[in-house]
From Swiss-Prot:
Topology of this chain in the membrane: Multi-pass membrane protein
Region feature (Disordered): 1-81, 318-337, 365-396
Record topology, Cytoplasmic segments: 1-741, 793-858
Superkingdom field: Eukaryota
Organism for this UniProt entry: Saccharomyces cerevisiae (strain ATCC 204508 / S288c)
Parts of the chain on the Extracellular side: 763-771
Biased composition (Basic and acidic residues): 46-61, 367-379, 386-395
Annotated protein name in UniProt: Magnesium transporter ALR2
Entry-linked InterPro entries: Alr1-like (IPR044089), CorA_cytoplasmic_dom (IPR045861), CorA_TM1_TM2 (IPR045863), MgTranspt_CorA/ZnTranspt_ZntB (IPR002523)
Location relative to the cell: Cell membrane
PANTHER family the record matches: MAGNESIUM AND COBALT TRANSPORT PROTEIN/MITOCHONDRIAL IMPORT INNER MEMBRANE TRANSLOCASE SUBUNIT TIM8, MAGNESIUM TRANSPORTER ALR1-RELATED
Phylogenetic classification of the source organism: Eukaryota, Fungi, Dikarya, Ascomycota, Saccharomycotina
Length: 858
């Protein structure tokens, strides 16, 4: 025991081993002088005197027991005790019992900073707050005083660390120690590691008490000893699973590859961008955290069983006071719940499925739940920007029983999650994540260990489900935010372990009120699988699964191919709608000039509806070509080796070679780094660019066709409006002709009114005498005037010609009504105007007779 203790003065002569050199080189303390100075004088930190003052009596008793148990070193130990008493009076501080364990904790805390993968080099010398809290919690107060020293006894140490420790023990045992007063705390840590190395039993560790040591404030401290101590602590704590387990809550190892750990500069850059990254809680297998899924399933099942038990008790209690009618209430009271039934999973299909492991626990705890503490019947449901407020628990018991006893209704819970594997003929459909696995099955078995190629389709995920999926598959918070907020912009984004595609489809049900409304589809493509998200029911996923089953014997179905197939199916869904628009455009274009007597309002509505559909499809297709073009370009860059993958690999290789100064193994390091990087990253394959080019051609063709159809509809609309104007003009001409005839009759009756008016004055009225000759005279005059007027009017009408052109009609409309009935002056011109050839001849004569500037040269 005493051979392992050494002072700081004697430790300065220790030989520098190779493992220590490697440790110092890997830590690069030369680049950080503050870190080296801090470690050099790290032992000069003060320790409380209260622990020593309170344990004076225990110290004396332990001295007596220790001196009696170790007879060989009794003289040295007693001398140490005497000197310890003098030292304590002189103001120096010792380690005894809990005070010594407290000092050991302080040195172990410093080693945590080296184990933290996301701490900057400038912060390695300081103990972070969360690390201190975890360490204090890891050492329970109920443990014995040497509980911290007993950890890691059963764990094997690395070969390099054990050999380094043996060399230091051999060099330290060969020396003689002049005083036990100068024993350092480094020897205490070496002693602890040596005991764990030889498998010392905890009972024997209690008997082997170390000599009391003081902290030397001498400035000449050998950094080699401190580095060796740090390396030994790191190896001990690295193999201690019980201590590393709580530390994983604050680590970010799952989001850092080997390259990012090797490059401290790139790590600092990543830490400067403060995103709420998820902490590593479990081990990932092929990029999937199956333990997270298992925990979420257990929590969901427990909450579901508890809620079912509470509502079952409530329904049974209220059923005794109400009728046995189990039907739904009116739609006014369940309007909000109907939307929840459409988009969110229900508690359970039937109450008969409550036989689970957690049912006993639920039945035991149900009695302690008060009526006021019961949850609402319908909790608030939140997905993205849409939120359905839950309905408060009321007196409507018939609805509650029917809502939670679905065996009495014909309603089926919608399947919002679908799991598919490329080599499987089955597709698992479930209403929530825990229902994806059957009883006795695990998610690891469902995913086949995460081997390619799997596909999980999620419809209307809730916030909790989205949070679980993001933690399970390592989705970046920006991607999760775009999905939850339902980002409308189409784009392609490349991340470290996946790439994210946002693509739009539409509602293709003609009977739906949301026909042709856009639907956002989000695709997250990993190296071994695909995640898809959408907030409306779509048929593209089923079409792609059917296509995979047909082509998997001929095509290598991987995650990139699934992404291409889904985009291609979305693109092909536009073809039937565009074809129907083409037929409609041809029909309208032909009907514009043929339909005269049809209802013009229906025709205008038909044209307007077709134009609206065309503009909607053009808006949906406008951004897709650019997205596919950018996607294909990145695939080609990845094939040519000029993409972001090669750039990051080259930078990492250069940094690794510069730090380690390895010039001969650059090619080997580059291959290993490339392989490790490719295992943790996901880039679109180069052969997918060929398929994407085909999709781009389809998109451009459809967009150009829509442009042509929109022009046809626009021209047809203008032509039909022109036809309506012509019809309106013809109707006005008919009305004008009728009014002209009425005017002619009125003109004929005006002279008759003059005659009757004249004879109505105070004149001699014929017939005073007894003869009736005056009567026949008046009647004859009237008839004569009528006949004369008729012949004159007929002759006048024959002289008037109807307008032959629209210009003549417009000119005649500007004249008065009487002037339009006047005959034309040039009768010959009017006769020739009826013959087109005669008019051309007149024009030719007038053209030749006019002077011309070319005639003078003849």
């Amino acid at each position: 025991m005493s051979s392992l203790s050494t002072s700081f003065d004697s430790s300065s002569d220790l030989p520098r081993s190779k493992s220590v050199d490697n440790t110092a080189a890997s830590m690069k303390t030369g680049k950080y002088p503050k870190l080296e100075n801090y470690r050099q004088y790290s032992d000069a930190q003060p320790i409380r005197h209260e622990a020593l003052a309170l344990k004076v009596d225990e110290t004396k008793d332990s001295r007596h027991k220790f001196s009696s148990s170790n007879g060989e070193n009794s003289g040295v130990e007693n001398g140490g005790y005497v000197e310890k008493t003098n030292i304590s009076t002189s103001g120096r501080m010792d380690f005894e019992g809990e005070a010594e364990a407290e000092a050991v904790k302080r040195y172990q805390l410093r080693s945590f900073a080296l184990l933290s993968s996301n701490a900057r080099p400038s912060r390695l010398a300081k103990s972070e707050t969360h690390q201190k809290q975890i360490h204090v919690e890891s050492i329970a107060p109920s443990l014995p005083k040497n509980a911290a020293l007993e950890r890691g006894h059963d764990t094997a140490l690395p070969a390099g660390t054990s050999s380094n420790r043996c060399n230091l023990e051999a060099s330290s045992s060969a020396r003689t120690f002049t005083s036990a007063r100068k024993a350092s705390l480094v020897s205490a840590i070496f002693e602890t590691s040596a005991e764990s190395e030889h498998g010392t039993h905890p009972k024997q560790a209690k008997l082997k008490r170390r000599t009391y040591s003081t902290i030397s404030t001498h400035s000449s401290v050998n950094p080699t000893t401190l580095l060796t101590r740090t390396a030994s602590q790191k190896s001990d704590m690295g193999n201690d699973t019980r201590r590393i387990k709580p530390l994983r809550m604050d680590s970010r190892v799952s989001f850092h590859s080997e390259i990012s750990q090797a490059s401290r500069d790139s790590q600092e850059t990543e830490e400067d961008v403060c995103f709420p990254m998820f902490r590593l809680l479990h081990t990932r297998v092929n990029g999937v955290d199956f333990d997270e899924l298992e925990e979420y399933a257990q929590i969901s099942n427990a909450e579901r069983n508890l809620s079912l038990a509470n509502h079952q008790r409530h329904s049974e209690r209220t059923y005794n006071h109400t009728d046995q009618d189990t039907g739904f209430t009116n739609s006014a009271s369940t309007s909000g719940s109907s939307a929840a039934l459409k988009y969110t999973p229900e508690i359970s299909r039937t109450l008969e499925k409550n036989c689970s492991v957690n049912e006993m626990y639920v039945s035991e705890n149900n009695e302690s739940v008060r009526e006021d503490d019961k949850p609402d019947l319908h909790p608030d449901v939140t997905f993205g920007r849409n939120k359905i407020e839950g309905e408060k628990e009321g007196n409507d018991s018939s609805y509650s029983r029917a809502y939670y006893t679905l065996q009495n209704t014909e309603y089926q819970i919608p399947s919002r999650f679908s799991f598919f594997r490329s080599e499987s003929d089955e597709t698992v459909h479930a209403s929530d994540i825990p229902s994806l696995i059957s009883e006795g099955q695990t998610f690891y078995e469902l995913f086949k260990g995460g081997d390619p190629t799997w596909w999980l389709d999620c419809s209307c995920p809730t916030d909790d489900e989205m949070r679980c999926i993001a933690k399970t598959f390592g989705i970046h918070p920006l991607t999760a935010e775009d999905i939850r907020m339902q980002e409308t912009r189409e784009k392609v984004e490349l991340f470290k372990s996946y790439y994210f595609v946002c693509f739009h489809t539409f509602e293709n049900d003609k009977e739906s009120e949301n026909y042709l409304e856009p639907i956002n589809v989000y695709i997250v493509v990993f190296r071994s699988g695909v995640l898809t998200f959408h907030f409306d029911p779509i048929s593209h996923c089923a079409n792609v699964r059917r296509r995979v089953r047909q082509l998997r014997d001929y095509v290598s179905v991987n995650s990139d191919w699934l992404c291409y197939a889904l985009i291609d199916d979305i693109t092909d869904s536009f073809a039937p709608v565009i074809q129907s628009i083409e037929y409609e455009a041809d029909s309208i274009d032909d009907s514009v000039f043929m339909t005269r007597d049809m209802d013009f309002a229906a025709m205008l509505q038909r044209i307007g509806e077709s134009r609206r559909k065309t503009m909607t499809l053009m808006r949906l297709l406008s951004g897709k070509a650019d997205v596919i073009k950018m996607f294909a370009k990145r695939c080609q860059d990845e094939t040519n080796g000029i993409g972001p993958v090669l750039k990051s690999q080259t930078n990492m290789v250069n940094l690794q070679a510069e730090q380690e100064n390895v010039n001969q193994n650059n090619s080997n390091n580059q291959i290993s780094l490339s392989n490790s990087y490719m295992q943790t990253t996901s880039q679109p394959r180069g052969d997918i660019a060929l398929y994407l080019g085909d999709i781009q051609d389809h998109l451009l063709t459809m967009f150009q066709n829509l442009l042509a159809y929109e022009k046809i509809f626009s021209r047809s609309h203008a032509n039909y409006l022109a036809q309506l104007q012509v019809e309106s003009f013809n109707s006005n001409n008919k009305v004008t002709e009728m009014l002209g005839k009425v005017t002619m009759l009125g003109t004929m009756l005006v002279p008759l009114n003059v005659i009757t008016g004249l004879f109505g004055m105070n004149v001699k009225v014929p017939g005073r005498n007894g003869s009736i000759a005056w009567w026949y005279g008046i009647l004859g005059v009237l008839l004569l005037l009528a006949v004369i007027s008729w012949f004159l009017a007929s002759y006048w009408i024959k002289k008037i010609d109807p307008p032959a052109t629209l210009n003549e009609a417009a000119g005649s409309g500007a004249k008065s009504v009487i002037s339009s009935f006047l005959p034309k002056r040039d009768k010959r011109f009017n006769d020739d105007s009826k013959n087109g050839n005669a008019r051309v001849g007149v024009r030719r004569k007038s053209t030749v007779s006019l002077p011309s500037r070319y005639s003078r040269y003849n």
